[in-house]
């Protein structure tokens, strides 16, 4: 019996080791090693389904003054991403109180109208969309799904290993494991991914013909809007000081890709008034 328990405890860990061996990927531009075991086709199908659900619930605007700049800039960024198997899609959600944007797997992007005042112009919009396309290009959703799977497998192994403990002890240890996994594994990965999306986005906007310095200006505007930030170690995003330092450090690299495009003229975005009650979530995901 003791031998069986030992084997049971080892199996989940062995499974993770196997996954690590076969699930290695490399993020574009940053060359960061990634643990991804979720197939890209599955990740994309989930993204497409989720995107349709979101668009079905939200108020989508077809007003060209909002849609045209998003799609024009978005397609330039998508072309720079050089991912032709993605069916890139850019839509605008009519919600002036939400200053946000999001990316789902497969190249499905949405921007809330509340982001327009902070983006300010097409260069600022390029910084936002570069960030979102960066998430999609680096398969961050698939990476998070793979990471969650690994945590579940390790949690299963821990619960098997606690078989001889009292129920109270098992419960306390499993709760501590859950908190430790979130603070020690899941959230730091999210910060890593957010920083990586900034890095990749900076390069993409430069390749698309937009001055990457506009990204630094964008995050300074966000910082002014959100004067209070959660402590960085409990945040899923880098704080603004860290973000600005990172971007400043990456600018020389991004400028190596930048070639001013005479076909691009930076245009002011339509004014809709300042974002309102949802400022706490006002930051591209």
Over which residues does each language-model region extend?
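A Zn2+-metalloprotease active-site environment signal
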Residues: 6, 11-12, 24-285
């Amino acid at each position: 019996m003791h031998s069986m328990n030992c084997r049971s405890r080892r199996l989940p860990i062995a499974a993770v080791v196997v996954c690590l061996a076969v699930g290695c990927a490399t993020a574009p531009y940053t060359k960061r090693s990634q643990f991804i075991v979720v197939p890209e086709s599955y990740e994309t199908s989930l993204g497409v389904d989720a995107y349709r659900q979101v668009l079905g619930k939200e108020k989508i605007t077809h007003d060209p003054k909002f849609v045209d700049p998003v799609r024009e800039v978005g397609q330039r960024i998508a072309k720079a991403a050089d991912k032709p198997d993605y069916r890139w899609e850019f839509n605008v959600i009519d919600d002036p109180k939400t200053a946000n944007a999001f990316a789902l797997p497969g190249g499905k992007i949405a921007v809330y109208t509340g982001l327009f005042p902070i983006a300010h112009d097409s260069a600022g919009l390029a910084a936002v969309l570069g960030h979102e396309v960066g998430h999609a290009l680096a398969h961050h959703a698939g990476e998070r799904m793979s990471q969650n799977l690994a945590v579940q497998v390790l949690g299963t192994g821990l619960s098997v290993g606690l078989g001889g403990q009292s129920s109270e002890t098992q419960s306390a240890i499993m709760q501590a494991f859950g908190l430790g996994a979130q603070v020690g594994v899941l959230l730091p990965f999210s910060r890593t991914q957010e920083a990586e999306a900034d890095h990749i986005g900076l390069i993409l906007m430069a390749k698309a013909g937009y001055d990457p310095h506009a990204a630094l200006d964008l995050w300074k505007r966000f910082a002014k809007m959100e004067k209070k930030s959660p402590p960085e170690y409990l945040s899923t995003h880098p704080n603004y000081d860290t973000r600005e330092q990172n971007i400043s450090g990456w600018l020389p690299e991004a400028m190596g890709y930048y070639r001013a495009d005479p076909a691009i003229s930076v245009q002011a975005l339509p004014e809709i008034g300042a974002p309102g009650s949802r400022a706490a979530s006002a930051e591209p995901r």
